[in-house]
Structures are given as structure tokens and as C-alpha cells.
Amino acid sequence: MKLFSRTSLVALGTAAAITLSGVTAPAFADEDSNAAVSALKTAEDNTPEAPGASTPLKLEQPGTITGVPGKAITPVTVKVVAGEAESFTSDNLPSGLLIDNTGKITGTPKKEFTGSAKIIAKNEAGVEAEVYVNFDFNEEPSSEEPSSGSSDTDNIENWIKIITAVIGALTTILTFSTKLDSFLK
């Protein structure tokens, strides 16, 4: 009687085999279910694995990269958490930024940009992994008038104008309703 190969499950004879937890046991259609079953341990699979195939390539998404157009960003590296990357590429990094073969993103953004870019890492075997990196490059707010930190007191003159307009509107409504009331009597 011949058994199946554990990895290929190809019939080598007339018996069928079921593989469970690395043990191959014969199984027949007319098998006595109360009979004692002996199991044979299969040979270890000593097939060498292809380089880079043992660990899949996996990347970790860094936090949002922020900055101001015209000022260099603090370099950020895309971290490889599984496998070993040989190169990094991106076709849609914001203008002025570069990524090197270690996954380090550097440069100076040329214009405002808020969005993401796809980073692709490749290992020696050609296996690719991708991650999306978020960017937020905006102009700094103008500092013409120093802010006190409270929007309620920053423009007190505007608040005074608004309150005066509301009081005037209420006075007009009360005056009109009084005249209307006396007219209807």
C-alpha cells in the first residue's frame, strides 16, 4: 500500500490519505470505524525556500508628515516590520520630496499639498509591499496681529458693532409692535 505525499496529496497507489498535523494515515471507503488506526510520521520537508520567501515584506505607515512649502521637512523613514527591503519607490510624492533605498523621505515641499502618496518597497526576490503616507503642507498663518488666544477678545470692536446692531433691531421691533398694537385698538 502506498500513501499520499503530505505536501502534494497525489495518490501513489490505491489507498487514500488524510493529512492532519503532519501525520499521514490511510483512509479507505470500506474502513471499519472501530478498528485501531496506526499513523506514520511523514518525512520533513527539506526543500530550501527562495530568498525573501520565508518572511513576507510588510511596511509600517508613519504618521502624517507636516510642513510648510519652501522649508525642508524633518526626514521620515518608512519602517519595514517584516522581511528585508532592497529598494523603495514612489511615483506620486509631493513636489520637492524624495525617497531613498532605505525608505527615508527627505526634501523641501515646493507647494501646498494635503493628501497621500503610495510608497512601494521591493525585496531581493521581487516581492513588493506598499503603504500610503499622508502629507499636510500648508502656508503658515500670517502673524500680522498677535492673537491673544481667545476669539472672543481678538476683535472686540466687531463684537461691539454686532451688539449695537442687535439692540437697534430689538428697539425697532418693540417700537413697531407698540404702534401696531395701538393701531389695532
Curated annotation (Swiss-Prot):
<dbReference type="GO" id="GO:0005975">
    <property type="term" value="P:carbohydrate metabolic process"/>
</dbReference>
<keyword id="KW-0732">Signal</keyword>
<keyword id="KW-0325">Glycoprotein</keyword>
<protein>
    <recommendedName>
        <fullName>Uncharacterized protein Cgl1651/cg1859</fullName>
    </recommendedName>
</protein>
<feature type="signal peptide">
    <location>
        <begin position="1"/>
        <end position="29"/>
    </location>
</feature>
<keyword id="KW-0964">Secreted</keyword>
<dbReference type="InterPro" id="IPR013783">
    <property type="entry name" value="Ig-like_fold"/>
</dbReference>
<feature type="region of interest" description="Disordered">
    <location>
        <begin position="41"/>
        <end position="66"/>
    </location>
</feature>
<dbReference type="GO" id="GO:0005576">
    <property type="term" value="C:extracellular region"/>
</dbReference>
